[in-house]
């Protein structure tokens, strides 16, 4: 099973916020996921990023590939990926 860390879109029309989830790469964007590891709200000023550092480290260690957007969010949140 190819596992990715990616964004799941939530919220209302024109007012999105995103949950950062670990999901099978074959699942739809807003479909089934394995675990929720945080959220991202681009609407607030400044935008809100909250990630569970332990879960991020665990999933990267177990081989989950973060998408490009999630990589940027991890860097912005100040989490060092070993």
Swiss-Prot record:
InterPro entries: Ribosomal_bS16, Ribosomal_bS16_CS, Ribosomal_bS16_dom_sf. GO terms for molecular function: structural constituent of ribosome. The keyword Flavoprotein does not apply. It comes from the Bacteria. PROSITE patterns: RIBOSOMAL_S16. The keyword Ribosomal protein applies. Keywords: Ribonucleoprotein, Ribosomal protein. One of its GO terms (cellular component) is small ribosomal subunit. GO terms for biological process: translation. It holds the Pfam family Ribosomal_S16. NCBIfam families: S16. Belongs to the bacterial ribosomal protein bS16 family. This is Small ribosomal subunit protein bS16.
